Amino acid sequence: MSTQQDLRERRRQRLRFQLRRKGGGRPRLSVFRSGKNIYAQVIDDVAGRTLAAASSLDKALREQLKTGADSDAAVAVGKLVAERAVAAGVSLVVFDRGSYMYHGRIKALAEAAREGGLAF
């Protein structure tokens, strides 16, 4: 019988495979959510480089946020990663939600990144 971690890993790998197949070489906006913080990176898999990154632990956001674990923090991180990606010359990405459902903090981050100038 599979554990919860095994099932989560299988979901993540299945989604990553689909993104690689349909992504067409576009950078991916990868999201990691922990119990206390949220992290986002724009990754160029072809070159193997991180083009832009932001998290609720960034000094620019830490003073503004009450906690890094709510939707307000996700919105702030989404806007910041979009701003940094556009500054790096990236506007078209593929959204990699990992094994997480598109709901709550993940959805808030995605919508804020769209408002910030990223298209996916």
UniProtKB/Swiss-Prot annotation:
Alphabetically list the UniProt keywords: Ribonucleoprotein, Ribosomal protein, RNA-binding, rRNA-binding
Q: Known SUPFAM superfamilies for this protein? A: Translational machinery components
Question: What's the short name of a Pfam family annotated to this entry?
Answer: Ribosomal_L18p
Annotated GO CC locations: cytosolic large ribosomal subunit
Q: Which GO terms describe its biological process?
A: translation
Q: One MF term from GO for this chain?
A: 5S rRNA binding
- The lineage's top-level taxon is Bacteria
**Of which family is this protein a member?**
Belongs to the universal ribosomal protein uL18 family.
Q: Describe its assembly.
A: Part of the 50S ribosomal subunit; part of the 5S rRNA/L5/L18/L25 subcomplex. Contacts the 5S and 23S rRNAs.
As for what it does, the entry says: This is one of the proteins that bind and probably mediate the attachment of the 5S RNA into the large ribosomal subunit, where it forms part of the central protuberance.
Q: What is this protein called?
A: Large ribosomal subunit protein uL18
Organism, as annotated: Gluconacetobacter diazotrophicus (strain ATCC 49037 / DSM 5601 / CCUG 37298 / CIP 103539 / LMG 7603 / PAl5)
